[in-house]
């Protein structure tokens, strides 16, 4: 029962963040981290010409994740585990198309057309179709937080290194407190595409590394390779989880003290009992999910009714940089999840209060 509750239910969300969406997320982070870098440059005596050069580099990295066509093999390692996937991204005007196929463990194919994501599990013949508006908006939400980045992170350029056969500029992002992790990022010099991203612990150790082992940039756009499998679902049991916008106050909750720098960016209700109800199925019990972001990373708070059969004991578990804190709070079961230190999760959990019975 340890990781079989909300962790399992939202596994596909984590996979997407770790793979295809990781490119856009990290690239967006580079773009919004610029104010901190500008301050660091001024303090170290770097001139305005160099600051402008870094600004252009960061913005190009952000644009590359959204507007470049590329395909390659993406590898994620951390916590003694490693996984890989074949990833392709195509852009035609305002439309974006992505596909990700796992190369390890159980076969899993993920296809995205803008904010519609279809996940196929060939072995079990299950298809999950989701309107992942939250995921699609994450880069924009993070960019909106650029006024806070300099307060909580320092950003520095750190030379050039080679990744997957490409010369890449290196950026180091250091936290100013103990409530968040640091990052080291690599971007292709020619295109700006993010090539590698490391999550760094408090002692500068690598908690997780996500990188291309091979990638071809500028490939021909092939949206049909994404759209066709999204439509061909014969023989699959199709599940369509739905997200319903809400507010913590509406659900009878309040967060009195989020970690410094984190702001609420979304609050929804989503179905329990697996990833959702099958087409035409009855409505299921729901969990409340509130997402908080500091501009570079996020924390999710899940609240569901306590169930003694499923919620056997409190726990704190780690998978790479992702920590999960689960505990009972009265008649409720609270799960706090994020790529942040344990102190951050505990602060969120302590600040959560029930405002109505």
Can you say where each PLM-predicted feature lies in the sequence?
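N-terminal mature ectodomain segment of secretory-pathway/periplasmic proteins
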Residues: 2, 39-125, 151-200
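Acidic/charged, solvent-exposed loop-and-adjacent secondary-structure segments enriched in E/D, K/R, S/T
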Residues: 121-141
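Short, solvent-exposed recognition patches
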Residues: 234-330, 342-347
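N-terminal secretory signal peptides that target proteins for export/translocation
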Residues: 1-15
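Surface-exposed amphipathic alpha-helical segments
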Residues: 191-193, 200, 204-223, 335-357
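Sec-dependent N-terminal signal peptides
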Residues: 12-26
